[in-house]
Amino acid sequence: ETYVLSIVPSGPLKAEIAQRLEDVFAGKNTDLEALMEWLKTRPILSPLTKGILGFVFTLTVPSERGLQRRRFVQNALNGNGDPNNMDRAVKLYKKLKREITFHGAKEVALSYSTGALASCMGLIYNRMGTVTTEVAFGLVCATCEQIADSQHRSHRQMATITNPLIRHENRMVLASTTAKAMEQMAGSSEQAAEAMEVASQARQMVQAMRTIGTHPNSSTGLRDNLLENLQAYQNRMGVQMQRFK
């Protein structure tokens, strides 16, 4: 979720896509065809961003085995029709077949160009090759990191993520997740109203930041405040913080 959102331009559409992704990963959205139709008609997004989102939706939403592949995703993931990209994509695919973890796949993929990575996604999308879901997500995240890096014109560093756009998006995703956890924990306790209030404020903040677009550093405080509030609330409730670290 974090990586994919880091390549979507700020605006009302980003907030909408964030909600769709959240629903998809939570298993709430099970109509892949409707989701793809919605994605296809979104304005602003580049064909490649649509292709990556379509790939993620297809990986995550359970669907009928024979469901037709979508042309707009295939076209976006063909490596600009460059045969070099396709050659590299095949080499990368062979390496990915040997990987079993998300991090292993991401590490391998990061040494390839965006065109080769997109072509490799295309191979998997068109069912010309199969990898585990973990590995496919490693490929997606490597591609998004490269795109976000080129947008930020910063150099990738393998050990840690230094890209402020990705860190910013990660903090907002964390804030949303924490807000959701607070709402679930609130239940019928006396402090429920307070918890719901804090969670609701956090959601509104995240939505506003995604819609308006803010400086990547501006989300640090949001995440920290929310975690502080959650910790204080949990201490009063006598609940362990373990789940949300």
UniProtKB/Swiss-Prot annotation:
GO terms for molecular function: RNA binding; structural constituent of virion. It is found in: Virion membrane; Host nucleus. Its main location: virion. Keywords: Host nucleus, Membrane, RNA-binding, Viral matrix protein, Virion. Residues 1-157 are annotated as: Membrane-binding. One of its GO terms (cellular component) is membrane. Residues 158-245 are annotated as: RNP-binding. Gene3D superfamilies: 1.10.10.180, 1.20.91.10. It is a multi-pass membrane protein. It comes from the Viruses. A motif (Nuclear localization signal) lies at residues 94-98. Coiled coil: none annotated. Plays critical roles in virus replication, from virus entry and uncoating to assembly and budding of the virus particle. M1 binding to ribonucleocapsids (RNPs) in nucleus seems to inhibit viral transcription. Interaction of viral NEP with M1-RNP is thought to promote nuclear export of the complex, which is targeted to the virion assembly site at the apical plasma membrane in polarized epithelial cells. Interactions with NA and HA may bring M1, a non-raft-associated protein, into lipid rafts. Forms a continuous shell on the inner side of the lipid bilayer in virion, where it binds the RNP. Determines the virion's shape: spherical or filamentous. Clinical isolates of influenza are characterized by the presence of significant proportion of filamentous virions, whereas after multiple passage on eggs or cell culture, virions have only spherical morphology. Filamentous virions are thought to be important to infect neighboring cells, and spherical virions more suited to spread through aerosol between hosts organisms. Most abundant protein in virion. When expressed alone can form virus-like particles in transfected cells. Homodimer and homomultimer. Interacts with NEP. Binds ribonucleocapsid by both interacting with genomic RNA and NP protein. May interact with HA and NA. Cannot bind NP without genomic RNA. Belongs to the influenza viruses Matrix protein M1 family. This is Matrix protein 1. It comes from Influenza A virus (strain A/Guinea fowl/Hong Kong/38/2002 H5N1 genotype X0).
